[in-house]
Every structure is written in structure tokens, then in C-alpha cells.
């Protein structure tokens, strides 16, 4: 069996890994911890990236690994590239990872390679300096230079809103810096970059339809898996669902692939999965890059399995051990699939988490369904509302014979789970 190290495994990774364990094709090893779940996230207190990499290098040199995988944006993707380089295993160039993950530097590179696909942008240092004028006019959209899951992403209309948005208590500021610290320690060792990753990226506001382009590179050759539509909750910039296949015209999808190809070659992105988010503006027919992520979108890739009949994790693991992936699209039960995100936009008075028995009943009725729960309370709930503007309490992946069947199954499943928020029930209208 090939030996694969999984770094900072995510809940969606575990579904695919369990299936592969049963096949006895790979032997998996795990390192890292879950930033979102207690008590694992206590490890963040003591986490130091360079000693962590050195420890793994010593440990796995003796074991004889065949490959390393991570779909973890915050720490895992960069560590996987660095560790693969040290152990002589297949992996991406750490410089390409940094060029993707440092969102301001990434914009500078994008501007050189595909300027037509880049919105106006500017860097804002943190802490704010009210004596220095901004290089971008209000209103603008702001996001951290180094972050994930849309944390602290928001439209800002004036200086007061900016100050309020970036006002943190002692623990919040410590947590933010602690999450960025590993990247900040590695960046100057590999690059001459001086732009502090604790700062923020401000961008002109773009409206339009959002989509996600998935694919992978091997030896510099680019392969696309497909495009997924990103649908927002009405009147927000918050994901409501991800739907495959995309309903955008083929011509638009092909243009996105052309932009992605130029960008990936320009970044020297030669190995591993990627996902690139785009805005499409129907009025102007423009495509703009939102961001590029140097990893698989683990929440979304099993949508391809439902519709196209192959598991992208098979591709991911083959890449990790240096094999050429073979994608065999097969007959499948579904023509469409979606990842539905359940959210509250106001603090719930009372949360009723479905019992294990109720969840088992749902999965018995819908064996293709995958559902994850993220219930929070107390300070964690308060922080999620502050940092994300909403509270994500569950995610459901589901297939359908067609879109009508997809939303019918979704509605019936919601009834069984007692998820009856009107915003959820009206998904089919978006």
C-alpha cells in the first residue's frame, strides 16, 4: 500500500479517506489539528510552523512516505509543499503557494498576467493609520491578506465603518495574529516580500454571478474538473449554495479557463489541485478573478462524483504519490448536485440540534446525502457573527435527477431535520 500523509484533515476529507481505507489502496497517516473544534484547537496556543515541519521531516524520513496531501488553507497547503520539497516527494513549489495565499501579492501577480480580469485594489496596513489617506475610494470590499472562509470580508462604506470593522478585543487580535503567524514566519525565508500579511486587501465593489473553477496541475499540465455556480443569500455576500454543473454559457466557462491557464502558468503552478473563483458581469460580459486557492475545495468536490461518476479524491491521491490520474466518467444517478449552506443572520433564540437517531433516519432516506453540523454557542457564536456576518450551522451535499428533483429532495430533507427557515425553503427561487 502507498503511504500518504494527510495534514490538517478536514471533515469532508474524512468521508473520502474512510472509503479509501476500506479499499486498502492507501495507508494514511495524520498530523495537525482542527482549528474549528474544541479541544483540538487548543493546539494553536503552542503551534510553531518551523519546528512542526522539522519534526515531521524527521518522523517521516524514517517511515518512507509516498505522498502528502492537504486541503487546509490556513496552514496545511503551505506545510505540505515545504515538507514534500524536503522529503523529495511530489508537491507544488512553496513560492507558488505563497503567491496564491498572500492576497495582495497575488493581485499584483494577477495584474501582470491577466490585467483584464483584475479589479482595482489597494493594500491597507493594520493597525489603521488615520493620518495616511487610503489609495482607494469608499465604498470598497475588504478582506484580510491572509485568511479563509470569508472571515472579516465585508463591504465598507466609510472610515467609521472601517474602524468599527477592525476593532478587536485583546483575545480576537491575538487569535488573528496567531492564525497568520505561520505564514508570516515562512514568507521572508523564501521571498523578498515585505508586505505584512497581517494587513488587508481593499477592492472595488463588483457585482455579478459568482462561480468556482476546479482543476489540477501535473508537471505543469493543466486539467479542469468543471465549474460550480456560487449562489448567495438574497441581499448578502454570503454563500447559500454551490451548484453543479454551472448554468453559465459555455463561452463564459471557456473564457474563465483561458484566464486560469494564463494565471497558473504565470504563477509557475505545476502540481496539485486549485480552485479559482470568478465574478461574471452579464451587463459588461466581463470576468473578474475573486481569488485563487492552492488546494482542493473539499466541501465541493464530491458534487462531481454525484454527477460525473468519479471521485476527485482518487485524482488527489494519485497526484500525491506521483502517478498520472485516470479520470473515468461513469454513469451516475444524478444530473445535478448542490452543497447547501444553512445559516442564521440573527442570533437564534434557541438551537435544536438533530439527534443521532434523526440524522440516521435522514441518511437512510437519502443515502447519497452528506451533512455536517457546526453548532456553536457563547463566545464562539458571537465571534462568528462578528467575523462572518452570519452563523453557519450546517452544510448538506445532495444530488438530484434534475434541478426540480434536487430542490424537492432538499425541501423534504429540511422538513425531516426541522430546518424550516424561509430563507432556506426558498432556495429554488435563486
Language-model features, listed with the residues they occupy:
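Beta-strand scaffold of nucleotide-dependent catalytic cores
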Residues: 154, 164-166, 200-204, 210-231, ...
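Short amphipathic alpha-helices in soluble, non-transmembrane regions
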Residues: 169, 354-359, 406-415
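N-terminal beta-alpha lobe that positions the nucleotide/phosphoryl donor
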Residues: 49, 53-63, 85, 95-141, ...
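Glycine-rich active-site loop/lid that clamps phosphate-bearing ligands
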Residues: 345-377
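ATP-binding N-terminal substructure of ATP-dependent carboxylate-amine bond-forming enzymes
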Residues: 1-96, 127-130, 322, 374-384, ...
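Conserved ATP-binding module of the ATP-grasp superfamily
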Residues: 117-119, 159-206, 238-239, 261-266
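A short glycine-rich, hydrophobically flanked beta-strand micro-motif that places a catalytic Asp/Glu
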Residues: 270-283, 427-430
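Active-site "cap" helix and flanking loop/linker of ATP-utilizing ligase/carboxylase catalytic domains
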Residues: 255-276, 294-351
